[in-house]
């Protein structure tokens, strides 16, 4: 009788263990799907905001060349519409950051950055999602998203880019809430 009880208890524990493993696996898969959807949504939002900002910068530069206040306001509007803290900036064709909060940055050029080169060298690039970089101005790790800005004749005029603070996203619990 004792042996039978031990066998039944062992089988029951084994079944419970497998049930817990299946539930943990299902919960983990659901969480991963949720995080992927959240990041996909963020990337889509950034793409729309950057495309819109690039179009507005092109329009402003065509109508009012050198009007930094209007372009700075455009960038502030675009970044305020996003669900996380993002810094929007824009460069001229030489890679100098000339638009965005806290500009100008006279000694900071982004011409050597991959995201700048990709936009400069590829007129049809669209959204470029770069590898995380250590930002020179913010002095922290950032994820960079960029789009090309053109002159009215289609020539390269610079880029508009968004810097997403990686630590800020990880620490923002509200960002991951459904």
Question: Which residue stretches match the model-derived regions?
Answer:
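An N-terminal domain-start capping segment
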Residues: 1, 40, 44, 141-147
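Juxtamembrane extracytoplasmic/periplasmic/luminal helical "stalk" adjacent to the first N-terminal
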Residues: 3-65, 76-84
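Short alpha-helical linear motifs
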Residues: 52, 70, 92-95
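Short, glycine- and charge-enriched coil/turn segments that flank and shape catalytic ligand pockets
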Residues: 62-66, 151-154
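Polar/charged, Q/E/K-enriched amphipathic alpha-helical segments with strong coiled-coil propensity
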Residues: 64-65, 70, 170
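Structural motif corresponding to alpha-helix initiation and N-cap regions
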Residues: 68-73, 112-113
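Extracytoplasmic/periplasmic ligand-binding sensor regions of membrane-associated signaling proteins
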Residues: 79-87, 93-176
